[in-house]
Structures are given as structure tokens and as C-alpha cells.
A protein has these predicted regions:
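N-terminal beta1-alpha1 ligand-phosphate binding loop
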Residues: 2-22
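Short linear Ser/Thr-Pro motifs
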Residues: 8-10, 29, 96
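Short loop/helix-cap segments at secondary-structure boundaries that form the rim of catalytic
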Residues: 15-19, 36, 58-59
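Short, glycine/serine-rich, charged loops/turns that create anion-binding
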Residues: 11, 31, 113
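A short beta-strand-loop structural module common to alpha/beta enzyme folds
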Residues: 25-34
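Anionic-ligand binding patches
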Residues: 2-5, 39-184
Length: 184
């Protein structure tokens, strides 16, 4: 296989890429991460994953580049990373005792080949009291996560169930990535 590059600064994505048990490099993409939430969100997040991969691929044309991005959607509102602690609290109140979708877009890019896709997982949250929300925000875990929670961290205790791929919620549907990388 050619050089493999992960175009992401996310420590969670690095953890998941490690599960492939294949050597890879990390080169952080400088792509603009804005999306137009008035468009089809799966298409938007797939396009963002493409932009991330393509930005890194331009200078690494001998490699296979994996780009990804994740959004949380509830009641047609896209929840990105919180701006501050108050924004994290607002998001957690929305998620509390509710169901939301997590969409992770992925692009695998090499010379002459593009595989751009997304995976969706439904997440069911338990009710969170104001005290629990404050305690969770005080842990600082929510501050760099889309939707203000980490399914693999302290946020796990608030999740009642999921429908779909757990790793999609973490930020990279690794089984799907592994399957698709076989054709590169």
C-alpha cells in the first residue's frame, strides 16, 4: 500500500486509525471547516471531508489521504464544537432526554481515485440535571467536541443507546474506512 496520511488533528481519529494496525502519518489540513447548514447535511459533511483530504493531498500526491469531519444534528440544528462553556451547556440541554444524529463524513483520496461517503448514527441521551451539566462542562471534556460530549469519555454515562456505528460518533467509522481502503 502507498503512504497513508490522516488529514486531521483529532486525537480520537488518531486512536481509531491506530486500530488499522498500519503505519500512517498525520498532516493537519488547513481547509476551511465551515458548512452551509441549509443544504443536505450529509453532502455538506462529505464535501468538508473531501476539502480536508484534498488540501493535504495537493502536497502529497504519492499518498492515500483520509480526511474526515463530524457534526451533531438535533431538530435541524447543527451542533459543532462549543464556543465557550455557556454554549456547551446550551448544547447539553438540547441533547438531554432527546435523540440526535451524528454524521461523520469521510474522504479517501489518492491519485486517480476518490471515495467520499458518510455514516449516520442515532444517539439517545438520558436526562441530565443542571448540576450534571455543570459538572460535565467543568471537566472541560465537552470543549473540543462536536455536540459538547465524548461518547468514549465521561459523556458515556449520559447515553442510553445508539443506533448505528459507535466509531461514527467518535469521529471515524473505522470498519467502513478499513473496508474501503482495501481498494486503494
Amino acid at each position: 500500500m502507498q503512504r497513508l496520511i490522516l488529514a486531521s488533528k483529532s486525537p480520537r481519529r488518531r486512536e481509531l486509525m491506530d486500530l488499522l494496525n498500519k503505519p500512517y502519518e498525520v498532516i493537519v489540513s488547513e481547509a476551511d471547516e465551515s458548512i452551509d447548514s441549509s443544504n443536505d447535511l450529509r453532502k455538506e459533511i462529505e464535501h468538508l471531508a473531501y476539502k480536508k483530504a484534498e488540501t493535504v493531498f495537493k502536497d502529497n500526491r504519492d499518498a492515500v489521504v483520509v480526511g474526515a469531519d463530524t457534526i451533531v444534528v438535533i431538530n435541524n440544528e447543527v451542533l459543532g464544537k462549543p464556543k465557550d462553556e455557556d454554549d456547551a451547556r446550551r448544547m447539553l440541554r438540547l441533547l438531554s432526554n432527546n435523540v440526535h444524529k451524528v454524521i461523520t463524513g469521510v474522504c479517501i483520496l489518492s491519485e486517480g481515485k476518490i471515495d467520499n461517503f458518510s455514516c449516520v448514527t442515532k444517539v439517545y441521551f438520558n436526562e441530565m440535571s443542571e448540576e450534571e451539566i455543570d459538572e460535565y462542562v467543568a471537566s472541560f471534556e465537552p470543549m473540543d467536541k462536536a455536540g459538547s460530549y465524548a461518547i468514549q469519555g465521561f459523556g458515556a454515562k449520559y447515553i442510553r443507546a445508539i443506533e448505528g456505528d459507535y466509531y461514527t460518533v467518535m469521529g471515524l467509522p473505522i470498519a467502513e474506512v478499513y473496508k474501503r481502503l482495501k481498494s486503494f
